[in-house]
């Protein structure tokens, strides 16, 4: 279990409207006492009974370029859009984690992009800058789930490390539900690196 307890700070309902016309309503939840001190937020979608049901949960790391600007260098924006709708259909939680660039920060991520343009893959670029291949720690995510009363969940992810970390932190992952594969010419190298290097469950054609 996570090393300390966090508590719910605020709950507020937010209408969500996406550029493709999809809309829904989320309950945004903020927290006090998160171990890393960051302003992570949970979006509760579909009015689940979190204490009784096994909700569908997505851990989504912040990606300004993909989530906001629609960058085609990654699949983050389409994954976020897909996750909101799928979770709203079944009831569950999307944790929006402030971990830009696999937790190296925005400017460093853009530096890594420049190295990728010179031929490195996404993981090689991070290590060339002196960072871990993936610096993300999900202790705060486990704290958030505990504060929401979620002990068992189905995890919407292609990333086996999220399953490993949550399990080690005392969260029961009943099932792993893969996201779709959002490939385009701009992100094929990125997706292939994730599949080949870190075992993401991504099936690419060609």
Where are these regions (language model features)?
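Catalytic domains of riboflavin
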Residues: 1-206
């Amino acid at each position: 279990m996570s090393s300390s307890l966090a508590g719910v700070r605020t709950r507020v309902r937010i209408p969500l409207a996406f550029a493709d016309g999809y809309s829904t309503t989320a309950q945004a939840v903020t927290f006090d006492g998160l171990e890393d001190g960051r302003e992570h937020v949970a979006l509760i979608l579909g009015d689940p009974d979190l204490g009784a049901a096994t909700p569908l949960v997505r851990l989504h790391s912040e990606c300004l370029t993909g989530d906001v600007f629609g960058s085609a260098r990654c699949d983050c924006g389409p994954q976020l859009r897909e996750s909101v709708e799928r979770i709203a259909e079944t009831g569950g939680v999307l944790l929006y984690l402030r971990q830009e660039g696999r937790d190296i920060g925005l400017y460093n991520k853009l530096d890594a992009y420049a190295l990728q343009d010179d031929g490195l893959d996404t993981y090689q670029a991070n290590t060339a800058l002196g960072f871990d291949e993936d610096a993300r720690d999900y202790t705060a995510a486990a704290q958030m789930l505990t504060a929401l009363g979620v002990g068992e969940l189905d995890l919407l992810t292609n990333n086996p490390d999220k399953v490993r970390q949550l399990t080690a932190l005392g969260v029961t992952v009943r099932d792993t539900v893969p996201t779709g594969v959002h490939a385009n010419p701009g992100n094929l190298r990125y997706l292939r690196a994730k599949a080949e290097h870190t075992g993401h469950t991504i099936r690419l054609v060609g």
